């Protein structure tokens, strides 16, 4: 079973590390090509392209400039500990045991605009390059064209290595669009998280993102290997709703706190 999640815009390169083990990203040659393209952009161009403030554009121009192909624990940190958005608040990887990291390294993948696919312990230098950004490159007009089948092929390798054919899609639509489902040697299961608001259940972005992290943690902590085991997920008040679910979609609901 292979879990897919999105990266985060918020990064943490200060907190103490909970493991010293690390691996290197497998697609760095591709990352280097994107860095070459990104370095051509001025801070105002970055601001427009990414729809971010001038201050953030300056920070990211500096990140592109400072990026180097030799990754060490001094200039990079493990991806699962560097990302700090809502998904990662739910995941809480900073509390993982070494055995948890082992299981995650085999069964969890983070999709990335710059790195393509990251394993949890892959070192990562700081960046911001969302998958949906239209960064022109030698392979096309955006990052989807740049990555082509590369991400899908890398996921197929991971599936073959663990000897099964199930992908748990906990990534956002923007990131999962970089995967080619018809070329993926897997059954795709998509958990959906609905929160009650004024008597109606709907996807509330902040809660849904955190729930994706909670579900990832649930799978890792319990060493789950079969999709039917996901229905036992009950973190922070969520419960499985069989009637709303279908073959490829598992629906979890949570009542509004009154």
UniProtKB/Swiss-Prot annotation:
Disulfide bonds listed in the record: none
Top-level taxonomic group: Bacteria
Annotated InterPro entries: YaaA
A Pfam family that the UniProt record links to this protein: H2O2_YaaD
GO CC terms, sorted: cytosol
GO biological process assignments: response to hydroperoxide
Family designation: Belongs to the UPF0246 family.
Entry-linked HAMAP family: UPF0246
NCBIfam families per UniProt: PRK02101.1-1 (NF002541), PRK02101.1-3 (NF002542)
Annotated PANTHER family: PEROXIDE STRESS RESISTANCE PROTEIN YAAA (PTHR30283:SF4), PEROXIDE STRESS RESPONSE PROTEIN YAAA (PTHR30283)
Name recorded for this polypeptide: UPF0246 protein YaaA
Organism: Escherichia coli O139:H28 (strain E24377A / ETEC)
Gene behind the chain: yaaA
């Amino acid at each position: 079973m292979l879990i897919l999640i999105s990266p985060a815009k918020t990064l943490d390169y200060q907190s103490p590390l909970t493991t010293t083990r690390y691996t290197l990203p497998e697609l760095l040659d591709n990352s280097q090509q994107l860095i070459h393209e990104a370095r051509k952009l001025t801070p105002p161009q970055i601001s427009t392209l990414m729809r971010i403030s001038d201050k953030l554009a300056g920070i990211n121009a500096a990140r592109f400039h400072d990026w180097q192909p030799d990754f060490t624990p001094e200039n990079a940190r493990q991806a699962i500990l560097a990302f700090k958005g809502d998904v990662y608040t739910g995941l809480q990887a900073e509390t993982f045991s070494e055995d948890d990291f082992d299981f995650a390294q085999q069964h969890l993948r983070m999709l990335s605009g710059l790195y393509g696919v990251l394993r949890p312990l892959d070192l990562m230098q700081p960046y911001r390059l969302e998958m949906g950004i239209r960064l022109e490159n030698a392979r096309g007009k955006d990052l989807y064209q740049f990555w082509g089948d590369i991400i899908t092929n890398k996921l197929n390798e991971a599936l073959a290595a663990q000897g099964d054919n199930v992908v748990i899609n906990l990534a956002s639509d923007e990131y999962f669009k970089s995967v080619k489902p018809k070329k993926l040697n897997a059954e795709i299961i998509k958990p959906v998280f609905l929160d009650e608001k004024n008597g109606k259940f709907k996807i509330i972005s902040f809660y849904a993102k955190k729930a994706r992290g909670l579900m990832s943690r649930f799978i890792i902590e319990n060493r789950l290997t079969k999709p039917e085991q996901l229905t036992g997920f009950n973190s922070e008040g969520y419960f499985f709703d069989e009637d709303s679910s279908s073959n490829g979609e598992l629906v979890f609901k949570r009542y509004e706190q009154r």
